[in-house]
């Protein structure tokens, strides 16, 4: 029964366009629900981002069918840096930075329901001689150099520190295999070489007869093959809502094209495949309604931040772009979420100076034209002239919402 569950899940992952490769189809039949699966997350930043999130979703799918799931927090491996398909060596992080990053990322992983283990615990009592004898002895340098993940870096320069990364990832797999009965490692398509190294290490040090397998998943990319996870301004889309507000994430997904929206519904949501096809068919009847994008945005924000934040993001979006004169429905908390999505500009001595200084308008003539055409609004009300009485009281005497034309927005603050 459990074998069928794994096979069925792999077939679903293929239909969801996330499955990339597996090291052994035959061993799938040997895996049971008593076996665990893990994914590693190196705390190289203060938060995980949307590109990491797809691996969290993939791991959650295994958990949902009954497998034990573990997220490895790379307290040790983040001190080195994975060279896989990187153009240059990462700058080494300080211990203080790694500790701070670990604290935040652990909470994100635990909130998603995973057991979190810090791999620093595997190495903190191991000295260099222990490592060379119990780990290094089992790795062939020529084989390590032939891995695609590092081969491209050999000519441009690869430090021994980075070169040894795959040995630590392999040792992680062995420890989890022994102590947690983990037989499966999940990783992005760029992790194939590291996964194979782990399997080879287990074969040499434990047994060749264990049902250990590595499964790689496609990276999060758009229909043009570009990595997804950056906002239009180039900043990462973080899982931490203090770095990327739920509304900004919502808007990013809402603005995807139809092909990307469909693929992301498959890859990032837990909706049934039949439901996704139903949404797609409804969408195609009237693409201007952007039903796929709307459902995608809501589902992802809900799964990351909770239903309340998803409803808030929907409310803000509806107030800004759909419902006429609904600015007054936005709360102060809603307004703060707009940071990162619309420009916040400082208030000068008066409204006209503020607009000129922020390059929103260029002259009094242009200002008067917008006023005449009723194309300048503050908090949903028409600006009537240079002496317009600004309604600061609407937002705690701190913010004004400016709209120019049909779709240009700013928040003025003081």
Curated annotation (Swiss-Prot):
Q: Where is this motif: 'KMSKS' region?
A: 227-231
Q: How does it assemble?
A: Homodimer.
Q: Under what name is this protein listed? A: Tyrosine--tRNA ligase
Enzyme Commission (EC) number: 6.1.1.1
One GO term under biological process is: tyrosyl-tRNA aminoacylation
Q: Which InterPro entries match?
A: aa-tRNA-synth_Ic, Rossmann-like_a/b/a_fold, S4_RNA-bd_sf, SYY-like_C, Tyr-tRNA-ligase, Tyr-tRNA-ligase_bac-type, Tyr-tRNA-ligase_bac_1
The family this protein is said to belong to = Belongs to the class-I aminoacyl-tRNA synthetase family. TyrS type 1 subfamily.
Residues forming the S4 RNA-binding domain are 349-413
User: Gene of origin?
Assistant: tyrS
Question: What keywords would UniProt list here?
Answer: Aminoacyl-tRNA synthetase, ATP-binding, Cytoplasm, Ligase, Nucleotide-binding, Protein biosynthesis, RNA-binding
The residues that hold ATP are: 230
Source organism of the structure: Mycoplasmopsis pulmonis (strain UAB CTIP) (Mycoplasma pulmonis)
The terms under GO molecular function for this entry are: ATP binding; RNA binding; tyrosine-tRNA ligase activity
Q: What is the lineage of its organism?
A: Bacteria, Bacillati, Mycoplasmatota, Mycoplasmoidales, Metamycoplasmataceae
Q: Can you tell me which residues bind L-tyrosine?
A: 38, 165, 169
Q: Which Pfam families match?
A: SYY_C-terminal (PF22421), tRNA-synt_1b (PF00579)
What does UniProt give as the signal peptide span?
none
UniProt short sequence motif 'HIGH' region, positions renumbered to this chain: 43-52
Question: HAMAP family attached here?
Answer: Tyr_tRNA_synth_type1
């Amino acid at each position: 029964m459990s074998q069928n569950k794994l096979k069925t899940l792999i077939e679903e992952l293929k239909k969801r366009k996330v499955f990339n490769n597996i090291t052994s189809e035959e061993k799938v039949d040997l895996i049971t629900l008593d076996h665990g699966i893990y994914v590693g997350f190196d705390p190289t930043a203060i938060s995980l981002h949307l590109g990491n999130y797809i691996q969290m979703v993939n791991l959650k799918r295994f958990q949902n069918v009954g497998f034990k799931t573990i997220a490895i927090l790379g307290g040790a491996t983040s001190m080195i840096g994975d060279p896989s398909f990187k153009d240059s060596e990462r700058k080494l992080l300080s211990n203080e930075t790694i500790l701070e990053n670990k604290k935040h990322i652990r909470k994100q992983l635990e909130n998603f329901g995973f057991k979190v283990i810090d791999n620093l615990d595997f190495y903190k009592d191991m000295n260099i001689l222990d490592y060379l004898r119990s780990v290094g002895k089992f790795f062939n340098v020529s084989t390590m150099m032939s891995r695609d993940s590092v081969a491209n870096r050999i000519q441009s320069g690869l430090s021994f520190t980075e070169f040894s990364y795959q040995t630590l990832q392999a040792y992680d797999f062995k420890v989890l295999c022994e102590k947690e009965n983990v037989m499966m490692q999940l990783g992005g398509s760029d992790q194939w070489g590291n996964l194979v190294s782990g399997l080879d290490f287990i074969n040499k040090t434990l047994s060749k007869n264990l049902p250990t397998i590595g499964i790689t998943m496609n990276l999060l990319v758009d229909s043009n093959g570009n990595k997804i996870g950056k906002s239009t301004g180039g900043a990462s889309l973080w899982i931490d809502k203090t770095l990327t507000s739920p509304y900004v994430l919502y808007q990013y997904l809402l603005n995807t094209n139809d092909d990307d929206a469909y693929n992301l519904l498959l890859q990032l949501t837990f909706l049934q495949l039949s439901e996704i096809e139903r949404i797609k068919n409804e969408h195609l009847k009237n693409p201007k309604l952007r039903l796929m994008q709307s459902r995608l945005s809501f589902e992802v924000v809900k799964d990351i931040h909770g239903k309340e934040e998803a409803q808030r993001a929907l409310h803000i979006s509806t107030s800004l772009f759909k419902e006429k004169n609904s600015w007054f429905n936005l709360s102060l908390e809603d307004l703060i979420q707009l940071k990162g999505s619309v420009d916040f500009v400082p208030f000068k001595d008066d409204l006209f100076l503020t607009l000129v200084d922020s390059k929103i308008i260029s002259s009094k003539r242009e200002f008067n034209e917008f006023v005449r055409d009723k194309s300048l609004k503050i908090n949903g009300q028409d600006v009537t002239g240079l002496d317009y009485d600004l309604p600061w009281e609407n937002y705690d005497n701190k913010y004004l919402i400016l709209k120019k034309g049909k779709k240009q927005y700013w928040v003025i603050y003081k």
